[in-house]
Amino acid sequence: MSGSLNKVQLIGRLGADPEIKQMVNGKNVARLSIATSQTWKDKSTGERKEKTEWHRIVIFNEGLVNIVQQYLKKGANVYLEGQLSTRKWRD
């Protein structure tokens, strides 16, 4: 399908230290939990409201995994750019 785009940009905070896991092929992946928030003023009450969304991020690029492992900790501000990929799992 021409003219389509799958691009995501997030600016948020890490909710926990990154998880670094080794895959079966021996390569490492990083798993991140990122919080993004939006605020607005309720029109009827004038009260300030806030909504936080949590995003699960998986990084496969080895160079980026190394940077994540060295520099990112819980609470860090992060900027992420990538593509959405929907996955299913069973508990």
Language-model segment annotations:
Residues 1-91:
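Single-stranded nucleic acid-binding surfaces, predominantly the OB-fold ssDNA-binding core
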